[in-house]
């Protein structure tokens, strides 16, 4: 009996000691895990699901709904505005309707758009290389012809293009005016006669002695 009691007591002691050694490790693991989960719940509002001891962090770390560049993560806010809002924004963002610091002119209305289109530069009636389109204006419209610059008649090295002579209506008058301005003024010369008759008399007097010598 004593031997049986001794063996049973020894077995009980071994089992009890083993249980005592295993319980602290389990309690320690459980306490650390509970503390870790508690800290995670305090840091993040939503529950965190992790596996293999790897934490999956949230995309938005702050409780605010504002993200970078003014974007919002609120699902109630529509991502794209409606078509009416887009039209209004486009009309406001037009460069002719915007004032300084983003203000809009209340006196500006939509009827001024046609006036702006009319004030835009009309297509030029001048073609390339100084040519002008013949069908762009009527031949009787003299004012419009004067408004359009005449094509260049002078070529390189002072040469003129004869094909452009039809456009220069006053070519002869300009040439006569240039010749008249280039002639030296005879009124400023005191030793020479100023009239044509006096020049003829001088020439006849100079020729008369030569004729007498020949006779």
From Swiss-Prot:
Its main location: secreted. GO terms for cellular component: extracellular region. Disulfide bonds: none annotated. The modification Tryptophan amide is found at residue 129. The keyword Secreted applies. It comes from the Eukaryota. Residues 173-215 are annotated as: Disordered. One of its GO terms (biological process) is neuropeptide signaling pathway. Keywords: Amidation, Cleavage on pair of basic residues, Neuropeptide, Secreted, Signal. It is found in: Secreted. The modification Phenylalanine amide is found at residues 69, 101, 157. Residues 23-56, 160-215 form a propeptide. Residues 1-22 form the signal peptide. GO terms for molecular function: neuropeptide hormone activity. Plays a role in controlling food intake and regulating body size. Belongs to the NPY family. This is Short neuropeptide F.
């Amino acid at each position: 009996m004593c031997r049986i009691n001794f063996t049973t007591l020894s077995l009980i002691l071994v089992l009890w000691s083993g249980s005592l050694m295993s319980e602290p490790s389990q309690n320690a693991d459980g306490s650390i895990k509970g503390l870790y989960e508690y800290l995670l719940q305090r840091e993040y509002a939503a529950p965190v699901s992790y596996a293999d001891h790897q934490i999956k962090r949230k995309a938005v770390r702050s409780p605010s709904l504002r993200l970078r560049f003014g974007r919002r993560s609120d699902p109630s806010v529509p991502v794209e505005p409606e078509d009416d809002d887009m039209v209004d924004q486009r009309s406001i963002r037009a460069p002719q309707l915007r004032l300084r610091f983003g203000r809009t002119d209340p006196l500006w209305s939509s009827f001024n758009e046609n006036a702006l289109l009319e004030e835009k530069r009309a297509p030029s009636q001048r073609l390339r290389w100084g040519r002008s389109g013949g069908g762009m204006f009527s031949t009787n419209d003299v004012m419009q012809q004067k408004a359009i610059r005449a094509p260049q008649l002078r070529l390189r090295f002072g040469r003129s293009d004869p094909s452009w002579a039809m456009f220069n209506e006053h070519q002869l008058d300009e040439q006569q005016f240039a010749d008249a301005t280039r002639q030296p003024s005879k009124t400023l010369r005191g030793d020479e006669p100023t009239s044509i008759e006096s020049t003829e008399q001088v020439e006849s007097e100079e020729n008369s002695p030569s004729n007498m010598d020949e006779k």
